[in-house]
């Protein structure tokens, strides 16, 4: 049965690309869409940055028809600023406005934004209510289980967020205190999904790195779909691999070296076009190890790629990879 976020049909058991800072930009989103992602989210955008018209924030508003349905994700700690940012985002006509209540990094959380708001649930609910009231676009939330082990209130929080009008919730199976350490705990995500009061889609997130893992959480916890973050970095093929496995119970063959090099090269070129050579090359570095994961004796080439400082240099290294690893 198709899942709907408000009036947006996102298909049966949709796969969502997580909003990731300096990762979920248009070049990477285009690849993920090509390889099977159903719903895109922008990198998270500072509400204050949007209001100030800061270039770093406004550039993240760039969305394209080819990647729809797409959500623009915002974060902040002031209700008035978040409402104003929502109005700015609405001009770009995204299908979804997503609120980040999950970012655990200190510079965000210590200001009471992102996962920081998990220490002030009444404010979280009030902020969400005001954002929902300020737009006709479906509003969704991405959050965590709680601030720490003693404040895992996600079952109640999800109900209250639904009551003020959100149209879907994505839950990362860790607390803010955990950051990304340890294993994601999906049991509470399952409790939210199986709470008879919950009527909106519940998407799970955390440690989704294989088709087998997706099948496990789908069957065990009944989630409406999954949001994939780190598992997609440098590996956009994961979306089609998951879809194929859920449909056939068979694993797709991993991309060969030519496919990996071709997609990596395209990703690099689009990143440079979009962000300029220096930034494009710098932000590609986090992708290289995953593009060429599990290839023996690759360390030398990976080191060369992450230390390269020009497009021509990286492209020459990729040519060498294609030549020297043609059997993979």
Residues covered by each model-derived region:
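Flavin-dependent oxidoreductase catalytic cores
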Residues: 1-328
């Amino acid at each position: 049965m198709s899942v709907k976020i408000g009036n947006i049909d996102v298909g049966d058991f949709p796969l969502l690309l997580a909003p990731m800072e300096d990762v979920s930009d248009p070049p990477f989103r285009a690849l993920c869409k090509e390889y099977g992602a159903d719903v895109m989210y922008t990198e998270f955008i500072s509400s204050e940055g949007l209001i100030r018209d800061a270039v770093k924030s406004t550039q993240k508003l760039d969305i394209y028809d080819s990647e729809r349905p797409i959500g623009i994700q915002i974060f902040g700690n002031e209700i008035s600023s978040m409402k104003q940012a929502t109005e700015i985002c609405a001009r770009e006509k995204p299908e979804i406005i997503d609120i980040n209540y999950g970012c655990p990094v200190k510079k965000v959380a210590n200001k009471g934004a992102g996962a920081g708001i998990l220490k002030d649930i009444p404010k979280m609910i009030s902020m969400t209510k005001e954002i929902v009231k300020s737009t006709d676009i479906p509003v969704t939330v991405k959050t965590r289980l709680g601030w720490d082990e003693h404040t895992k209130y996600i079952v109640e929080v999800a109900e209250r967020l639904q009551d003020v009008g959100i149209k879907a919730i994505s839950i990362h199976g860790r607390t803010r205190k955990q950051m990304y350490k340890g294993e994601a705990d999906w049991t509470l995500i399952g409790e939210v999904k199986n709470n008879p009061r919950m009527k909106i889609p519940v998407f799970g997130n955390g440690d989704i790195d294989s088709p087998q893992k997706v099948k496990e959480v789908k069957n065990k916890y009944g989630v409406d779909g999954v949001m994939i973050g780190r598992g997609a970095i440098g590996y956009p093929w994961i979306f089609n691999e998951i879809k194929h496995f859920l449909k056939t119970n068979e694993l797709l063959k991993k991309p060969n070296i030519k496919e990996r090099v071709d997609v990596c090269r395209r990703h690099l070129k689009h990143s440079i076009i979009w962000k300029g050579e220096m930034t494009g090359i710098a932000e590609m570095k986090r992708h290289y190890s995953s593009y060429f994961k599990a290839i023996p004796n690759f360390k030398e080439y990976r080191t060369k790629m992450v230390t390269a400082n020009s497009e021509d240099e990286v492209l020459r290294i990729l040519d060498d990879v294609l030549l020297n690893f043609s059997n993979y």
